[in-house]
Amino acid sequence: MDRRGAPVKQDSAKVEQRMEELRTLLEYHGHRYYVMDEPEISDAEYDALFRELVRLEEEHPEHIHPGSPTHKVGGQILDGLKPREHSLRMYSLDNAFGIEEFREFVERVVRLEPDAPLEFWVDPKMDGLAMELVYENGVFLLAVTRGDGSMGEDVTHTMRTVRNVRMRLNPEIEAPVRLEVRGEVIITRADFEALNARQQQKGGKLFANPRNAAAGSVRQLDSSVAAARPLRFMAYGVGQVVWADGRQRWRTQYDIMRGLQELGFAVPSQGRLCAAPADVEAAFTELSAARHELPFEIDGVVAKLNDLDLQEALGFTARAPRWAIALKFPAHQARTRLKDIRIQVGRTGVMTPVAELEPVTVGGVTVSSATLHNEDEIRAKGLMLGDVVIVQRAGDVIPEVVRAVPEERTGAEREYVFPAVCPVCGSAAVRGEGEAAWRCTNMQCPAVRKQAIIHFVSKAGLDIDGVGRKWIEQLVDSGRVVSPADLFRITREDLLGMERMGEKLASNFIEAFDSARHESTLQRFICALGIRHVGEQTARTLAARFGNMDELMRADQETLQSLRDIGGEVAGSIRAFFANGQNRELLQQFKNLGLWPEEQQPAGDSTPVTPLAGKKILFTGSLVRMTRSEAKAMAEKAGAAVMSGVSARLDILVAGDKPGSKLEKARSLGITVLTEDEFIRQASESEEISGQAADDYENSLLRVQ
């Protein structure tokens, strides 16, 4: 970044590397936040990483990976809770940091729908656990967490104990025959203070914040734990709504909120109808000033276009609705002193500077360190050791050094000189032409080896269940593990010699390593190797093309370069990795240990050719012969891309019963409309589907015939 915060032009390899780093960071911190309920960084820090990745993907679409955190909501299913699919996906929200970004959102809406009525419903953005409650004929049926948006966790047993969750809806008001209510499970500030006071009194662990307390309580296997906690459910919207006569009663977001309140749900009293975007801005300013006086924690407001037909017309992106946005409050800032800058060494040898700060409270959280990314950022921000600096938690979560305060310098400050040697092993550090990062040149550097092993077991690698960073650090530091292959040679006795390692945990580790050895896919194994410039998408391409490691290792530069998504630099990096003697020795160890996965059937270039191949398709209305998810799977197997909304780019609309406004809009745009039977027939007209893909495809057709 330059001094004005504008992005500095970067070469393709550097950009791809940074995008891979961001994906890995976001997956890791998303796991800590959504699955473990033990975040290591603030929401603002996470938002900053997320926004950087969004920007890079917009500027460099050639490096976008299908598994990017920007295409998904985030979260995973925990062992012990039953997974359950949402009938309609629970999307995340795009963020606007300030009024200007909200105005840009409004401009996008107007471009998509020039005659759109710009009336909004505005709610406080509550900081809790997103939840869906399902009612049938007015009776509570089940409760499901948001999870990854498509699949959540069944927490019916704990949500039954939440005091303001009604088991039966108000009998004096007509209720839908099926109603999916969406909202947040929260703990108020006063209840949170009382809860922690009780925890302290009985010597229990104190909760970090109300959100963690709420999330941890809901996901207990023992419902009595949740029953003892001061949980509340606050509704903000709906999923699927089915009325007995098939006619919709609610036409606006305002109707929904009023209807939910009449049925007996708690809704935020601060919600309001805004007749124009200017009123949304006023509500944002007002709630920002009053946020600390509210009974519960909020980090912004959510603005939704009020008209439900307009919401349907605008549709969704891969991760968020186009008709709603979260306006985040300004970051909390504080002054502190930059004591030192230390260097962290990553798995590829990248040396990342980290600011060591005098501890300071920012937005209720003590901050003592913050990443500085690279040497250029230190220079751009004009930082000197000993400087008074401004630190902020953007979006109230992630710490960032904003700038130095040069007017407070005393003359005792010192210029920071980026080290020319690795601080861990003492080897020379180099900075490649066109790169921002300095790297340790010693691939046997203890820090590099440790980070490589951490990556190998991580979600971005083999995703070995239960084996986290701290355990790997302990294994490496104790000398039990020197390379990733050592993980598959380790014994129970080796593990039992470690601090805080019991019999059960040691057995779980051995079982996890054994499962990884026998069940890992070729794509995951390639990712786990940590080949420079090879991320999830490139690994998928390589696995599909070569089918096994032996063939991949024999591939020459020309063959690699001919593949989709792989250019000269990436091909060269792959060849260099397999030409390295130490890497080949490690790979031979993996082979001897039985960790040598193969694809069941190399995909090659054989893909379905059907009348739907290459088409953009959308489903609307109720399907009779299959579920919506089965229809989507069939379309994708037939080579089509499934869209989320009607636009001029759409090729085909499949209309089931009661298709609604999407059918009218599709016809007005001249889009081809198919019945469900016509869709199945066209999806079945496959000319070329090979190997396992053919079996899968045929089975999907049998299910609906």
Curated annotation (Swiss-Prot):
The active site is at residue 125. Coiled coil: none annotated. Pfam families: BRCT, DNA_ligase_aden, DNA_ligase_OB, DNA_ligase_ZBD, HHH_2, HHH_5, Nlig-Ia. The keyword Magnesium applies. InterPro entries: BRCT_dom, BRCT_dom_sf, DisA/LigA_HHH, DNA_ligase, DNA_ligase_AS, DNA_ligase_CS, DNAligase_adenylation, DNAligase_N. Residues 684-705 are annotated as: Disordered. PROSITE patterns: BRCT (PS50172), DNA_LIGASE_N1 (PS01055), DNA_LIGASE_N2 (PS01056). It catalyses: NAD(+) + (deoxyribonucleotide)n-3'-hydroxyl + 5'-phospho-(deoxyribonucleotide)m = (deoxyribonucleotide)n+m + AMP + beta-nicotinamide D-nucleotide. GO terms for biological process: DNA repair; DNA replication. GO terms for molecular function: DNA binding; DNA ligase (NAD+) activity; metal ion binding. Zn(2+) binds at residues 422, 425, 440, 445. Its cofactor is Mg(2+); Mn(2+). NAD(+) binds at residues 43-47, 92-93, 123, 146, 184, 304, 328. GO terms for cellular component: cytosol. It comes from the Bacteria. Residues 607-696 form the BRCT domain. Its EC number is 6.5.1.2. Keywords: DNA damage, DNA repair, DNA replication, Ligase, Magnesium, Manganese, Metal-binding, NAD, Zinc. Belongs to the NAD-dependent DNA ligase family. LigA subfamily. DNA ligase that catalyzes the formation of phosphodiester linkages between 5'-phosphoryl and 3'-hydroxyl groups in double-stranded DNA using NAD as a coenzyme and as the energy source for the reaction. It is essential for DNA replication and repair of damaged DNA. HAMAP family: DNA_ligase_A (MF_01588). This is DNA ligase. The gene is ligA.
